[in-house]
């Protein structure tokens, strides 16, 4: 099968790699339909690293994936061949204290797609644990399926901060995660959502997704615009989603 392999910094090749075969117990074989390109994928491509994670060997990129179930392993229930699914990219060890207490996102042995040395999903087929695979509506456009992963980030953020009816929310950064945080905040009941960025195209996208006030921080004074829009009250919840240094 084919995969998009990052050979080294700024060198991405479509290569033939071994097919993963049939799924074992509790696993699914999934045919990948669409994969989102995250900022981390871009950094690995342009810089060959993110923080302490260096691409020392060829690696398949992509961790935001949507596909269809092609084969079902023993012990798996609730799935049928052909189901449209989203795939959670981080698979924990399921045997440490973090995993036992439901905080598996902190697992020290987490295997996260497209994080060196773990391969990602820009390939034709993957084998994935059924417990980290989620059914999507059959009529959903598969091209938006990968957005489930960043959407989960936004949902977690809104839940953790307790966004509720009447809140005035500020979101710094109008990229993918920032826009999704804005949408989720509105759905959670926020009265007003204010978004900022230095890119007019992103701000226009934020407006189209329901942001009440979009501020360009390079041409407008952020503080004065926020207080003006909120009649001097300011905001009671703020999210940092700019993702810059």
Predicted regions, residues:
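Glycine-rich beta-strand-centered segment in the early N-terminal region that forms part
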Residues: 18, 22-35, 50-97, 137-139
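Cytochrome P450 core scaffold surrounding the K-helix E-X-X-R motif
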Residues: 40-46
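Conserved acidic residues
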Residues: 83, 124, 212, 236
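NAD(P)H dinucleotide-binding glycine-rich loop of Rossmann-like/cofactor-binding domains
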Residues: 93-172
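Mid-domain Rossmann-like dinucleotide-binding core that forms the NAD(H)/NADP(H) cofactor-binding site
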Residues: 140-220, 224, 237
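Conserved amphipathic alpha-helix within the SDR
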Residues: 222-232
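Short SAM/SAH-binding signature in class I
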Residues: 233-239
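Beta-loop-alpha module in the N-terminal Rossmann-like domain of NAD(P)-dependent dehydrogenases
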Residues: 240-245
């Amino acid at each position: 099968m084919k995969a998009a392999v990052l050979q080294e910094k700024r060198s991405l090749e479509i290569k033939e790699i071994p097919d993963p075969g049939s799924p074992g117990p509790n696993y699914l074989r999934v045919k990948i339909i669409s994969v989102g390109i995250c900022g981390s994928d871009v950094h690995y491509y342009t810089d060959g690293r993110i923080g302490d994670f260096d691409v020392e060997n060829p690696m398949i990129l992509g961790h935001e994936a949507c596909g269809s179930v092609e084969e079902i392993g023993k012990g798996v229930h609730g799935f049928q061949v052909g189901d449209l699914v989203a795939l959670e990219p981080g698979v924990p060890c399921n045997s440490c204290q973090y995993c036992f207490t439901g905080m598996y996102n902190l697992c020290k042995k987490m295997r996260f797609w497209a994080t060196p040395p773990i391969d990602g999903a820009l390939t034709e087929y993957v084998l994935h644990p059924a417990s980290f695979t989620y059914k999507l509506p059959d009529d959903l456009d598969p091209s938006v399926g990968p957005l489930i992963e960043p959407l989960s980030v936004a949902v977690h953020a809104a839940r953790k901060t307790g966004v509720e009816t009447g809140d005035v929310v500020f979101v710094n950064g109008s990229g993918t995660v920032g826009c999704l945080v804005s949408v989720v905040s509105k759905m959670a009941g926020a009265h007003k959502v204010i978004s900022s960025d230095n890119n007019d195209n992103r701000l226009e996208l934020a407006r189209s997704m329901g942001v009440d006030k979009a501020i360009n921080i390079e041409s407008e004074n952020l503080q004065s615009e926020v207080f003006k829009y909120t009649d001097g009250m300011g905001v009671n919840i703020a999210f940092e989603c700019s993702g810059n240094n």
